[in-house]
Amino acid sequence: MPTAFVLLNTEIGAESEVVKALKEVEGVETAYNLWGVYDIIASVKADSIDKLTHIINKQIQEIDKVHSKLTMIISETGTPPT
């Protein structure tokens, strides 16, 4: 199942509002406030890569007060080789 981590920058003071909105988006599994360069991290899963990119580029990016995002799509799942 395609999965991505999305780092978001928001309008100052809007972090909790954006986290609440993220939790309403289908496919968003978790969303947390951060301290540092980015304001929020979210984990997103979908049935296909097309659906995943739609969620990120349309639903998440268009949340009010989201200024920018950095998306990291996981290339494979499972345990690392030993």
Residue ranges and their predicted role:
Residues 1-82:
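A compositional/biophysical signature of low hydrophobicity enriched in polar/charged and small residues
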